Amino acid sequence: MVSTKGRYALRVMLDLAEHADEGFIPLKDIALRQEVSKKYLEIIVRDLVGGKLIRGSSGKGGGYRLCRRPQDYTVGEIIELTEGTLAPIACLAADAGNCPRKDRCKTLPFWHEFDTMVHDFFYSRRLSDLLSAQADEPATKK
């Protein structure tokens, strides 16, 4: 399951992509648009900067911006950076050691298939795909 942190990280990335032509975007502006606490977003952007997905600038005119074009980010890399592995079981995680039951585990093929589906789902979608889907949505009536 993707936590709030992962979902908000994706929203921050989308917000930065939508406002990419405005230069560095102040975190307070993102927080207002996304209706998320600025304090919580500070934790998330720290991870995104550390993972080299976004760049930060302090001072007047400072804020955050994408390091790459929206089409150069996968949803999977954003989610995994903030959530950790997407593997459904520990023995399929990239940093897992050799499982002693690997050769006789009857459920491993099932979990491996599920892991492949999840990985392919997240890594086949790009930030630009989410922007396009958002633009295609009809306006909601109030």
Give, region by region, the residue ranges found by the protein language model:
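Alpha-helical residues within the helix-turn-helix
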Residues: L32, V49-G50
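Beta-hairpin "wing" of winged helix-turn-helix
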Residues: L53-C67
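Charged, amphipathic alpha-helical coiled-coil/dimerization segments
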Residues: G63-E80
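N-terminal helix-turn-helix DNA-binding core of bacterial DNA-binding proteins
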Residues: V2-T4, L10-S37
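C-terminal regulatory/oligomerization modules of transcriptional regulators
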Residues: V75, A93-K142
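Residue cluster at the C-terminal edge of the helix-turn-helix DNA-binding motif
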Residues: G50-L53, L81
